[in-house]
Amino acid sequence: MTRHQIESTVRTEYNKYKGTNAKKTRLSIGIGCGTASYEFDLYELNVVIGCISTSSWFNETGTNNTGGQDRASSELSWLSLWQGNESRVHILTDKEMAHRLFKKHSGALFPHSIEIHHFEINTKRFSLIGTL
C-alpha cells in the first residue's frame, strides 16, 4: 500500500471506530494576511481534528529516521496551533514511533490535550498510547 492508501484506510477505520465523518481538510490557522494553513488528515467541525503519520522510527538500515521523527513531532505543533474546540488526535501506524513520540513529549505542557494512538494496519485496530 502507498502512504496515501494507508492514510485513507486509517481515516475510514477511524470514522467507523469513533462514529465520525472526518475528512482530509486544509485549514487556515490564524487571522489576517499571511495566514498559515495546514492540511489535516482528519477533520470534522466541532468533533475531531487529527494527523496520521505513516513513518517508522527506524529507517531500512536500522538507523534513526530523523526526518520521519521530525515530521511526526511537527504534527503535534500544528494540532497545538489549532484554536477550535475539536478533540485532537495523532494516529501513527508504526508502534515504535507511537510509543517513542509519546515518551519524548510526555510532561510537555500542550495547550490542548492530544491523544496518541497506534493503528495496526493488518488487524485494523486502534490502541490508545496516551494523552499529551
PLM features per residue range, with description:
Residues 38-55:
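Active-site beta-strand-loop-beta-strand hairpin of nuclease catalytic cores
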Residues 52-108:
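Catalytic cores of nucleic-acid endonucleases
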